[in-house]
């Protein structure tokens, strides 16, 4: 609970901050539309397509025998498209549980000289298509599908960005828990630009659910903007890359050195000229 109170205090500080606002709208507070694993307040521009190739290797504490995680990789391939400058849709497919995911994302407010914050809403869902793993009692679509709603509230101070994201998730059936849950969440993240093309990020999510055995997800990354690509080098206690698994199944633990290295490779395509 102390962590939640600190996050709420940070949000109040953002709103009351006296830092000088930009004269022009601040549309991209962070380098990408995903913070690290979770969504950021950014959206794609109209007619912009982004392709995501996300890789997380196995646990680094497997040592040389597991080649520090390279033998047990998990992957997600995703696509996002900007319907308008404020509305993005996305789909993806992960190797974990052969899971398909999708989301809708709408930017409600944009930071500018008269508006201190950017506010974006996300509605996401996922569905595991793996066979012979989920019990018959949970085989219906409604039992297996998950849904996650988040509100992303972000603020930029030149080279520094901060975001809090309250949310609510219905997990669907979770094999490792042999159960399903519905609960509130609160995520927070910060980003610092070291240069025009390099930034560092940290994100954390708190679950208002005590029955799930795993720790809360905590991730860090270094972002490299090469022009046509965004390359993120990631270290996290969560190996998976869609909301349900990120939130409920972070199998690593920072305190034990049980972590997953990986990367996000994002390639953008602009169709405005066609």
Q: Where do the model's predicted regions map?
A:
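Sec-dependent N-terminal signal peptides
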Residues: 4-13
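Sec/Tat signal peptide C-region and signal peptidase I cleavage site
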Residues: 15-19
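Transmembrane beta-barrel domains of Gram-negative outer membranes and organellar outer membranes
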Residues: 20-138, 144-149, 154-164, 168-172, ...
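A mid-sequence, solvent-exposed acidic-amphipathic segment
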Residues: 161-206
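Short hydrophobic/aromatic segments of transmembrane alpha-helices and their interfaces
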Residues: 181, 213-214
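Substrate-binding/catalytic groove segments of enzymes
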Residues: 194-201, 212, 229-232
């Amino acid at each position: 609970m102390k962590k939640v109170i600190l996050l709420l205090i940070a949000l109040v500080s953002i709103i009351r901050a006296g830092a000088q606002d930009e004269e022009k709208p601040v549309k991209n507070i962070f380098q990408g539309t995903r913070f690290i694993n979770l969504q950021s307040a950014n959206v794609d521009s109209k007619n912009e397509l982004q392709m995501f190739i996300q890789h997380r290797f196995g646990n680094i504490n497997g040592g040389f025998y597991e080649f520090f995680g390279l033998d047990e990789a998990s992957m997600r391939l995703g696509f996002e498209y900007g319907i308008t400058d404020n509305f993005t849709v996305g789909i993806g497919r992960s190797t974990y549980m052969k899971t398909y995911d999708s989301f809708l994302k709408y930017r409600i407010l944009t930071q500018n000289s008269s508006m201190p914050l950017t506010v974006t809403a996300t509605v996401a869902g996922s569905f595991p298509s793996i066979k012979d793993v989920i019990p018959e009692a949970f085989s219906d679509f409604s039992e297996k599908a998950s849904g996650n709603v988040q509100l992303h509230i972000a603020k930029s101070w030149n080279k520094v960005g901060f975001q809090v994201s309250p949310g609510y998730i219905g997990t669907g059936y979770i094999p490792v828990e042999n159960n399903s849950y519905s609960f509130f969440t609160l995520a927070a993240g910060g980003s610092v630009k070291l240069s025009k093309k390099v930034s560092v990020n940290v994100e954390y999510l708190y679950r208002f659910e005590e029955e799930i055995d795993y720790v809360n997800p905590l991730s860090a990354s270094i972002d490299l903007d090469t022009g046509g690509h965004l390359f993120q080098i990631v270290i996290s206690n969560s190996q998976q890359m869609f909301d349900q698994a990120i939130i409920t199944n972070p199998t690593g633990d920072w305190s034990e050195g049980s972590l997953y290295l990986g990367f996000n490779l994002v390639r953008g395509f602009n169709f405005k000229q066609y």
